[in-house]
């Protein structure tokens, strides 16, 4: 495992002129432990900044971590026995980011055993402006993507996931789908939800898991990035355990 100290060095001064190796497909055992990963990121992430001020450093920090540890920030898999459609957070790179999505997918695949997992990232800008304006159009676009996946993969168990602004996008997508369509969704899992406390429209609350940490300003409707908003990787196993019975 490559040293996490390298990550801190690369992020020092917010400079990224180094040649970054292409991410490789690796097993999670080659990643840092979740606690090590989060501890090191906490040293370099813009804790206490607004999302507007923090955007570039969030993107660069996740890019560096992805390159160092072979964590894929982009997923466009074919459908599996179970398929996750995941919307990343504001300023997260790729189409699934690094902070939350990959850890959840890995935990879910482990929990599924021999069943196949397909992951598809939601291709939306994840911009600061979209976050501040409610990401409405992105929700409409995700709703269309959901319908497309259900049509092309009628036998898959579809799970919707989102982190930060991505949770907002999932809420907006559900609001643009009727109950009959949403009934085909097996589970919804949201991390760091800006709409915390608001139910997912047209969907069974018993099949919804919303994880919001104490002290997460984003979950309180704010725009300040505090440490509790960056640590949802530690909930990956819990989220996977929630999903598995719903896709069995």
Curated annotation (Swiss-Prot):
Give the record's pH note: Optimum pH is 4-7.
The Gene Ontology terms for molecular function here are:
cutinase activity
User: Which positions carry the signal peptide feature in this UniProt record?
Assistant: 1-17
Q: Where is this site: Transition state stabilizer?
A: 90, 165
Inhibition and activation profile: Weakly inhibited by n-undecyl phosphonate (C11Y4). Activity unaffected by paraoxon.
Give the CC-aspect GO terms. Answer: extracellular region
Principal EC category: hydrolase
What Gene Ontology biological process does one annotation of this record name? carbohydrate catabolic process
Q: Which residues form the active site?
A: 164, 216, 229
Q: How is it modified after translation?
A: The 2 disulfide bonds play a critical role in holding the catalytic residues in juxta-position; reduction of the disulfide bridges results in the complete inactivation of the enzyme.
Q: Which UniProt keywords apply?
A: Disulfide bond, Hydrolase, Secreted, Serine esterase, Signal
The listed locations are: Secreted
| Propeptide segment residues | 18-28
Q: What family is reported? A: Belongs to the cutinase family.
Role of this protein: Catalyzes the hydrolysis of complex carboxylic polyesters found in the cell wall of plants. Degrades cutin, a macromolecule that forms the structure of the plant cuticle.
Protein name as catalogued: Cutinase
UniProt organism field: Hypocrea jecorina (strain ATCC 56765 / BCRC 32924 / NRRL 11460 / Rut C-30) (Trichoderma reesei)
